[in-house]
Each structure stands twice: as structure tokens, then as C-alpha cells.
Amino acid sequence: MATSLSEPTKKRILQVCVKLFLEQGYKKTTMAEIIEKSGVSSSSFQNIFRAKDGVLTELVQFMFENQFSMARSAASVKLPPVYVYAVETAIQMTLTELNENLREIYLEAYTQKEACEYIQKETAKELYQIFGSYQPELTERDFYELEIGSAGIMRGYMAHPCDAELTLEKKLRLFFTMSLRAYNVPEEEIGRVIRFVEGLDIRTISEQVMQK
């Protein structure tokens, strides 16, 4: 756990990690490289993050907060919360098509236990707020269990790069159809959500997220 005194060190390590992960990939980046380029001692790194997967969990937290923030801005406060979910997941999936090393980061995040649990638990809280009215009999725990399944769908699509037949637009339509049906969203509303996202410049929005 980082203290207030270690916050500048933590920030410096994270900045170095983002640069290295995007340039050469998560798996190819070693702890030795991170420590050297951050200018910190091995003990300082381990006190804050324990290991490289600790950095990944921290980055995942930042990325998800940023994605939901951008999604809320793109969806506007006037639209139902389901649109925020659609834009957030569209951003996430689009990011993996913009940068192969970013694809690796997300896939690793959905694979490593600590990072994956963070994703599922935090997403479940959002899902409960967004979809609770569609299935009022379900608890937040129920939505956590549903998220385990929808996260698996998300990971599957992220792991499969787009091609001439499976375009990004088609991938998003398929994901929305499956996930929103699981949350009991009416078919007509699913159609409206899909058309809304297709009307956005989702690649530009995702690039803005990546720059942050």
C-alpha cells in the first residue's frame, strides 16, 4: 500500500510502466526494466506494488475510471444509463483494436486473478445501478455473477482481432445483443442503443481515452 510519501514514486513508476507496456507489451516488460527506468530501488517498488501484476491492477483501476468518465460524457446525462454501459464497453473493445500491446494489457487484466476480480466487482456495482430496474428481483451479488459471464464474452471478442468479416461495428453489435439480452433489456431498446453507438466516432473517443 502506497503512503502519501510514496505517491510521487508510485506515479513515476506508473508513468514508466504505461510507456513500456504500450511500446513493447506487458509480457515483454521486466521488473528490472521498470525499476531501472523509474529510478527507484527494488525494495521501493515491492513496497508499493509487490510485483508487476500489482502495477497491472493499479492501471486497470485508472483505465476503468477513465473509460466510465468518457462514456458518461459521450452518452450525455439526458440518456438512460444503459447508454453509458454501451459506450464504455465499446471504448474498451475499440481500444484493443487500436493498439496490439493494449490488447495484451486488457487480456492479461481479464486473466490475472486480482485485476480480474477488480474488474468484475466494480463493473457489477455499475451494472446493478444501470440494469437493476430491468430485473428488480436481482441483488448486487446476482449482477456480479452475471458479470462473470459477460466479462467472458468481452474477453473473447477482445482476444479475436477484427478482420474483413468480423468488423469492429459487427463485433460491437454482437456483444451488445448478447450482453443486453442477458440484462433483460427490451429488444427495441437494444436496437436504439446499437444505433446510438454506431452514430458515434467511437475510434476518436477511444483514442482520446488512450492519450489520457
Annotate each language-model stretch with its function.
Residues 12, 20-54, 58:
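Helix-turn-helix
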Residues 58, 69-102, 122:
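Hydrophobic alpha-helical connector segments
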Residues 59, 63, 67, 88, ...:
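Hydrophobic/aromatic residues within well-ordered alpha-helical segments
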Residues 71-75, 103-106, 157-165:
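Secondary-structure edge/capping motif, primarily at the C-terminal ends of alpha-helices
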Residues 103-108, 188-192:
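Short, hydrophobic secondary-structure boundary micro-motifs
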Residues 109-159, 170:
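Amphipathic alpha-helical packing segments from all-alpha helical-bundle domains
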Residues 129-133, 159, 163-212:
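C-terminal peripheral helix-coil segments that are non-catalytic and often amphipathic
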